[in-house]
């Protein structure tokens, strides 16, 4: 059965098998002989079908109402088993908002059985198809603002979105490119620029998913409206809400008022991008008929930054037309058609229009109501949609089009369209790491759901949070051109063409943005409808690297083979050349003293350092833009200015004046910096070590790893993982960074990245996190593909000819067991599959995607690979190659990397992951969150081992005391046994109650035997001279422990710290940089 299959039979809304029995008896009692006979004759077949169907989470399993639960618990039991299965808990015990979350990897469905009484953005799924999108609240439909929880730590700041709007979060509906025009925003970068041009942020359209259900019981009315207080909604039990990562359908099901079983199914159609469906089914398991009212509502008050044009109804449905704020010449329309077996009445107020149907639900029967919604805007086809009537006419046509069939047929066509994109096999699989497996599949889904192939004009725009949120005003940053694009390009190149089309659409404005007297084009930091320079989106004296990202996007598409020389001439070259021209004339200046080209008054990606000179990432990116312009010009036979070559070969790069030669983020940077996000590290990826060599790149990685602040955004550590994959020759930091990139940032239950590792504005550095943070989904995909396989779209260029190469540098993955598999990678008009297992890398050419493609692809294995060189892989051929294997950082260790698992029992500092303790890299660490409590870590050596000694490398915050204990028993054989059955002095056992059905707890002292305890001496005292250098420490505080014992499990405990004053604002506990046992 396909994911999200209904427990109702699709054609006649028949109930599930348990109530089916009751229905047969009820029919027989009324002498409905033929019906009863048919029911009984098919009972055995139906029951057998459901046994087969009962694979947990095959779509949306039916949950038997608690007040009338049969002894046959097939569906309920299996879902409960899934939620509490070790495989499922292994994922969600690591993620926030995930107490009752589940993931069914077979059907690729995520969901939760926990009813969120309070609507919170982290707990909400959404639907989207690249043109329309909507966030879905707890009841499965409708509009609500976020609601403050009853937690003692809840505060009003929890309800707010971030810069630049700082508005209250809500379950909004959005249309691609539907940007407004407004004088200003609450937050800006350069407020003085507001005088030069208005802002343009995304407008939320009226919420189209609202389909409420009302009933009166004992004189009190209850309504399924998520904006109401819980008392007005009524009791919700047996709750399940899920989202398919294969087709994007969101399904919500529950028992309401202990009386009805209600199911909502919502989709944004993948193929018919203007069409949304809300399908509701209500089942009455009782013995009396019940009257209910279904209301289809379009409420203009659920919109944001829109102006109402008309709200009304006709004989077939209801509709609303509107403009984005400040733009009367741009129109939007929503038309809703209700399909129900009853008399529909319609009414309206000044800002709301309803269509209602009163239905009688007979005992043991169900009713089905479907809402077909057409949504359109002028931007989709400006040449055809010239008036509001044109847009409304089209929306009405979409809503009432009989060709799409009934709800079941619409669901089927939607799934069919999705299957053409993702095909049958999962695009990424981590067989041995369920969290990475979910993160990869979710990231592909979220980026595909929020994009569509070849979108034109402003509808190709993709904001930081896609089509379900107005985080960052829905505006377009470099996040789209660099982070999202490089993440999804290898899987769906047609989708990323939309990003480039959007930049082409605004290219003339970018030309107009250039100051008088200069040439080229300059894009603003933020873009909406117009692409002009604004208070949020300055063009000058700020993040010039946005222009490199825009240029790089078109260049990457070209060298990937997804675009040809026609694209190069008409699209890529104008963008690249105009960027080069502007940068060469306006941004770059020749410094006679240095004999180099320099830059001034800019901001690199690290936005903690504004108005600096010679940003390392920016200067390096400028070099590449100059090179691309020259190569593209040569291919096309165009003359390019000599200055491009001069800048390419003589760009200044600031470096530290010592033997380590660390690249400075900007001229004059000192050692006290706290870096917001990946910056210099990005010189290695995606800028491929331009201006630096491998040694300098490696020392950069080590230095800047220690300088990242603990509250930076989620795109930082995917880059560190990629760079460690590329550079590290010992240890397994590539894999520890990979977990650091996902575990603190991914939110359950619907596997969406948050911008921050801590969502609390009061404690995370003052950020209201963007959500969902598609930037991180794109970054994570790059970490697993471009990182672990080393895949790069590369080329050679000789005699004005560009030869495409797929560069590969696959590495061994000791911490990831069976490795990783990739299917349906698109390169040079071919489909490839790639896999890393324990010993080899395998690549298969699965054939052409276009008839005119060559019969082969050319790959280049990196120099460090034992089989370095070029290889031709013909269509349908497969080849295997060795992996690059790092050596051990600590020879003879029994605990480094995959030899042991380190698991924190007490909380770590925000963003830290315990795998950093044994990854063989002293510049990564795990820090105890608090200094006034004991930090505890459990070590699993994976088998019974003889241990003679241990080494603790503390980093810059050694504890005052350390204690090591061993487990000598035999009843506990897994980490979860300890977590579930041992009282470590915190509430950890409550999170693992599923693994302790008897509820018996053991005291820590009864389980572990102390084998070492001692004070930690300072072996590397603080050296002010060293501290004030831009320098990776070569001295470490180390504690050596001599023991003689045998065990599999160890407990490490650390107390307090030596520092009496905080270093760099860090008030946490002890840091464990590396722990090694021999």
UniProtKB/Swiss-Prot annotation:
* Glycosylation: residue positions: 4, 17, 150, 184, 242, 287, 301, 350, 532, 591, 601, 661, 670, 829, 837, 904, 922, 931, 946, 1003, 1037
Q: Which PANTHER family does the protein's record reference?
A: GLYCOSYL HYDROLASE-RELATED (PTHR11051), PROTEIN-GLUCOSYLGALACTOSYLHYDROXYLYSINE GLUCOSIDASE (PTHR11051:SF8)
Q: What does this protein do?
A: Cell wall acid trehalase that catalyzes hydrolysis of the disaccharide trehalose and required for growth on trehalose as carbon source. Plays a role in dimorphic conversion and virulence.
**Induction remark:** Expression is repressed by glucose and by HAP43.
Protein's recorded name: Cell wall acid trehalase ATC1
Q: Name one GO biological process term.
A: trehalose catabolic process
In the UniProt record, the gene name given for this protein reads ATC1
Q: Which organism is it from?
A: Candida albicans (strain SC5314 / ATCC MYA-2876)
Q: Which family does it belong to?
A: Belongs to the glycosyl hydrolase 65 family.
Q: Where does substrate bind?
A: 478-479, 676-677
């Amino acid at each position: 059965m396909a994911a999200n299959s209904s427990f109702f039979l699709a054609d006649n809304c028949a109930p599930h098998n348990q109530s089916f029995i009751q229905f047969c008896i009820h029919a027989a009692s009324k002498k409905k002989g033929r019906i009863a006979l048919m029911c009984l004759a098919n009972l055995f077949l139906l029951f057998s079908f459901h046994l087969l169907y009962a694979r947990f989470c095959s779509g949306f399993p039916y949950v038997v109402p608690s007040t009338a639960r049969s002894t046959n618990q097939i569906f309920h039991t299996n879902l409960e088993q899934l939620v509490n299965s070790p495989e499922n808990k292994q994922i969600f015990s690591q993620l926030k908002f995930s107490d009752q979350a589940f993931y069914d990897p077979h059907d690729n469905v995520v969901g939760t059985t926990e009813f969120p009484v309070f609507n919170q953005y982290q707990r909400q799924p959404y639907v989207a198809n690249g043109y329309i999108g909507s966030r879905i609240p707890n009841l499965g439909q409708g509009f609500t603002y976020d609601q403050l929880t009853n937690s003692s730590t809840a505060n009003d700041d929890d309800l707010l979105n971030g810069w630049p709007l700082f508005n209250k979060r809500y379950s909004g509906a959005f249309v691609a490119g539907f940007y407004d025009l407004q004088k200003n925003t609450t937050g800006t970068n350069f407020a003085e620029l507001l005088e030069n041009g208005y802002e343009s942020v995304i407008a939320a359209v009226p919420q189209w998913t609202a389909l409420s259900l009302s009933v009166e019981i004992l004189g009190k009315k209850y309504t399924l409206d998520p904006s109401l207080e819980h008392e007005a909604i009524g009791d919700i039990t047996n709750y399940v809400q899920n989202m398919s990562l294969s087709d994007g359908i969101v399904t919500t099901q529950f028992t309401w008022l202990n009386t009805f079983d209600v199911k909502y199914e919502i989709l944004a159609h993948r193929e018919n991008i203007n069409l949304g469906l809300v399908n509701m089914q209500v089942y009455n398991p009782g013995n009396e008929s019940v009257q209910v009212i279904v209301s289809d509502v379009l409420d203009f008050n659920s919109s944001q930054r829109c102006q109402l044009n008309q709200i009304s109804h006709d004989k077939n449905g209801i509709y609303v037309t509107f403009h984005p704020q400040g733009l009367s010449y741009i129109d939007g329309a929503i038309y809703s058609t209700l399909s129900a077996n009853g008399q529909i009445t319609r009414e309206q107020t000044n800002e709301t229009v309803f269509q209602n149907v009163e239905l009688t639900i007979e005992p043991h029967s169900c009713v089905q109501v479907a809402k077909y919604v057409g949504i359109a805007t002028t931007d989709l086809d400006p040449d055809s949609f010239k008036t509001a009537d044109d847009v409304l006419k089209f929306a009405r046509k979409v809503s009432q089009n009989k060709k799409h069939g009934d709800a079941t047929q619409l669901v089927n066509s939607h799934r069919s369209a999705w299957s053409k994109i993702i095909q049958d096999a999962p695009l990424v699989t981590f067989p041995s790491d369920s969290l990475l497996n979910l993160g990869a599949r979710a990231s592909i889904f979220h980026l595909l759901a929020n994009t569509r192939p070849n979108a034109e004009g402003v509808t190709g725009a993709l904001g930081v949070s896609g089509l379900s949120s107005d985080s960052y005003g829905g505006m377009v940053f470099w996040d789209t051109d660099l982070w999202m694009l490089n993440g999804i390009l290898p899987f769906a190149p047609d989708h990323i063409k939309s990003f480039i089309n959007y930049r082409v659409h605004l290219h003339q404005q970018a030309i107009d943005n250039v100051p008088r007297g200069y040439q080229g084009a300059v894009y603003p930091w933020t873009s909406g409808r117009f692409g002009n320079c604004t208070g949020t989106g300055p063009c000058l004296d700020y993040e010039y690297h946005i222009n490199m990202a825009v240029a790089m996007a078109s260049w990457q598409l070209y060298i990937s083979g997804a675009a040809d020389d026609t694209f190069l001439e008409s699209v890529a070259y104008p963008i690249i050349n105009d960027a080069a021209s502007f940068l060469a004339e306006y941004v770059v200046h020749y410094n006679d003293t240095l004999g180099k080209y320099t830059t001034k008054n800019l901001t690199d990606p690290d936005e903690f350092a504004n108005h600096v000179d010679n940003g390392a990432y920016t200067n390096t990116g400028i070099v590449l833009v100059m090179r691309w312009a020259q190569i593209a010009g040569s291919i096309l036979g165009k003359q390019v200015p000599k200055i491009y070559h001069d800048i390419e070969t003589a760009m200044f790069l600031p470096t530290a004046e010592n033997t380590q030669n660390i690249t400075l983020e900007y001229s004059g940077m000192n050692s006290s910096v706290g870096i917001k996000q990946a910056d210099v590290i990005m010189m290695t990826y995606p800028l491929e070590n331009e201006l630096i060599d491998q040694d300098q790149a490696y020392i950069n990685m080590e230095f800047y790893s220690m300088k990242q602040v603990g509250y930076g955004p989620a795109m930082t550590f995917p880059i560190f993982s990629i760079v460690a994959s590329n550079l590290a020759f010992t240890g397994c930091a590539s894999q520890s960074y990979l977990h650091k990139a996902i575990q603190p940032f991914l939110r359950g239950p619907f596997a969406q990245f948050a911008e921050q590792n801590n969502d609390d504005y009061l404690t995370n550095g003052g950020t209201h996190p963007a959500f969902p943070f598609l930037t991180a989904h794109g970054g994570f995909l790059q970490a697993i593909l471009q990182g672990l396989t080393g895949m790069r779209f590369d080329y050679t260029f000789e005699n004005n000819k560009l030869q495409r190469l797929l560069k590969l540098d696959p590495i061994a993955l000791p911490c990831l067991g069976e490795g990783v598999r990739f299917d349906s990678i698109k390169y040079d008009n071919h489909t490839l599959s790639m896999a890393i297992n324990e010993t080899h890398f395998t690549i298969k050419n699965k054939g052409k995607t276009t008839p005119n493609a060559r019969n082969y692809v050319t790959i280049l294995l990196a120099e460090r690979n034992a089989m370095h060189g070029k290889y031709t892989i013909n269509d349908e051929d497969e080849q295997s190659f060795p992996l690059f294997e790092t050596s051990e950082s600590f020879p003879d260790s029994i605990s480094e990397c995959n030899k042991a698992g380190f698991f924190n029992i007490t909380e770590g500092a925000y963003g830290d992951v315990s795998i950093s303790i044994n990854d063989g890299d002293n510049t990564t660490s795990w820090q105890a969150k608090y200094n006034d409590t004991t930090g505890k870590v459990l070590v699993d050596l994976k088998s019974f081992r003889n241990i003679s000694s241990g080494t603790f490398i503390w980093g810059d915050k050694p504890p005052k005391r350390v204690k090591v204990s061993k487990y000598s028993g035999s009843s506990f054989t897994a980490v979860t046994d300890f977590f579930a059955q041992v009282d470590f002095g915190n509430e950890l056992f409550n999170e693992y109650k599923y693994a302790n059905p008897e509820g018996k707890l053991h005291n820590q002292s009864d389980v572990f035997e102390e084998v070492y305890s001692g004070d930690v001496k300072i072996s590397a005292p603080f050296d002010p001279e060293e501290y004030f250098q831009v320098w990776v420490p070569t001295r470490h505080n180390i504690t050596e422990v001599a023991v003689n014992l045998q065990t599999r499990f160890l407990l490490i405990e650390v107390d307090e710290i030596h520092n009496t004053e905080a270093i760099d604002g860090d008030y946490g506990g002890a840091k464990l940089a590396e722990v090694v046992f021999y």
